[in-house]
A protein has these predicted regions:
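Absolute protein N-terminus
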Residues: 1-2, 95
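Residues at secondary-structure transition points
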Residues: 13-16, 47, 65-69, 73
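Short amphipathic alpha-helical segments
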Residues: 14-35
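Short, well-ordered beta-strand segments in beta-rich or mixed alpha/beta enzyme
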Residues: 2-8, 39-66
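Glycine-rich beta-strand-turn "strand-cap" elements at beta-sheet edges
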Residues: 40-48, 76-95
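Short, flexible helix/strand-to-coil boundary loops that buttress conserved ligand/catalytic motifs
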Residues: 22, 66, 75-78
Length: 95
């Protein structure tokens, strides 16, 4: 299983726009083949810091997910939303 943790730092004035863009992606991604879970969390310690935690069956499922039009749209909008660069960690879940 492959795990992705993506941390997003969002400008205060872009918070509502970010959430409007990411919310439909959550449902869409969860319906994709190979998606075990796909959730967005907001930090309790830092306003407008969000962490997307994704669990995928394998790299092929991630590659297919990366073609999701809603994800592509979010990628295009992130420079406008971001207060600073996102941090993305991809890991393989061991036995």
């Amino acid at each position: 299983m492959e795990i992705i943790n993506a941390t997003f730092y969002i400008k205060e004035e872009k918070r509502a726009d970010f959430l409007a863009a990411v919310t439909p992606l959550l449902a869409s991604a969860r319906a994709e083949e190979g998606c075990h879970s796909y959730h967005l969390y907001e930090s309790l310690e830092e306003n407008n810091r969000f962490v997307m935690v994704e669990k995928w069956a394998n790299q092929e499922a991630i590659t297919a997910h990366n073609q999701n039009p809603l994800l592509q749209q979010l990628f295009q909008q992130m420079p406008d939303f971001a207060a600073k660069p996102s941090e993305i960690v991809v890991a393989h879940q061991g036995e």
